[in-house]
Swiss-Prot record:
Organism field: Pseudomonas paraeruginosa (strain DSM 24068 / PA7) (Pseudomonas aeruginosa (strain PA7))
InterPro entries: MPN (IPR037518), RadC_JAB (IPR025657), RuvA_2-like (IPR010994), UPF0758 (IPR001405), UPF0758_CS (IPR020891), UPF0758_N (IPR046778)
Motif JAMM motif per UniProt: ranges: 173-186
Family: Belongs to the UPF0758 family.
GO BP annotations, alphabetical order: proteolysis
Domain MPN: 102-224
Name of this chain's protein: UPF0758 protein PSPA7_6095
Entry superkingdom: Bacteria
GO molecular function: metal ion binding; metallopeptidase activity
PANTHER family: DNA REPAIR PROTEIN RADC, UPF0758 PROTEIN YEES-RELATED
Entry keywords, A to Z: Hydrolase, Metal-binding, Metalloprotease, Protease, Zinc
Length: 224
């Protein structure tokens, strides 16, 4: 049965317009993105099949071009469309942070950092540079690979803070394993960077670790 033959209240697009996007299931949201199904399979049925094949919505969204296009109903055009949607979401979050103080929008900070780093397959260390009103000046990835005390250089972080004329910053890195709990090396690195940046009067407000769930804040655990 085509989606057009469904009761109007059950059609994903009509349901979204009437009740809001948050009320839709992953399959319904994906069906709206797909727009059409394939022969003998509605968009919602195709969406359910794809979610089953990928294992989760997150896995689908974070797949590379080859993996994405290896599934029935998906191709290069859809992949490009998906990347554009994801980038618009990241830019929307970045715009919120440039407009408001990060202290007034803590969830926006978490959402933005999660959007930027959670999909990375390798460890990435980055900084969110802030002005005197704690608005975002820039986001920069500074180091990639195995993030530990030996691979992250305080001198480089200080150099970039001075280049942006930053008054404060937020440190962040991801754990590709999905476990956001900080290691002893993570905590020692945070202390070293905090000490180095204090010499140029730049405050380290927090260090977020990005895993599978909500970003973990070292400040909230008293580890700053």
């Amino acid at each position: 049965m085509s989606i057009r033959d469904w009761p109007e209240a059950e059609r994903p697009r009509e349901k979204l317009l009437e009740q809001g996007a948050a009320t839709l299931s992953d399959a319904e949201l994906l069906a709206i993105f797909l727009r059409t199904g394939v022969t003998g399979c509605s968009a919602v049925e195709l969406a359910r099949r794809l979610l089953g094949e990928f294992g989760s919505l997150r896995a689908l969204l974070e797949s590379d071009l080859a993996a994405f296009c290896g599934h029935l109903g998906l191709g290069v055009a859809k992949y490009a469309q998906l990347q554009a949607v994801l980038e618009m979401g990241r830019r929307h979050l970045a715009e919120r942070l440039r407009r408001d103080s990060v202290l007034e929008s803590p969830q926006a900070v978490r959402d933005y950092l999660k959007a930027r780093l959670r999909h990375e397959q390798h460890e990435v260390f980055a900084c969110l540079f802030l002005d005197t009103r704690h608005r975002v000046l820039a986001f920069e990835v500074l180091f990639q690979g195995s993030i530990d005390g030996a691979s992250v250089y305080p001198r480089q972080v200080v150099k970039r803070a001075l280049a942006h004329n930053a008054a404060a910053l937020i440190l962040t890195h991801n754990h590709p394993s999905g476990d956001a709990r900080p290691s002893l090396a993570d905590r020692q690195l945070t202390a070293r960077l905090k000490e180095a940046l204090a010499l140029i009067d730049v405050r380290v407000l927090d260090h977020f670790i990005i895993g599978d769930g909500e970003p973990l804040s070292l400040a909230e655990y008293g580890w700053m």
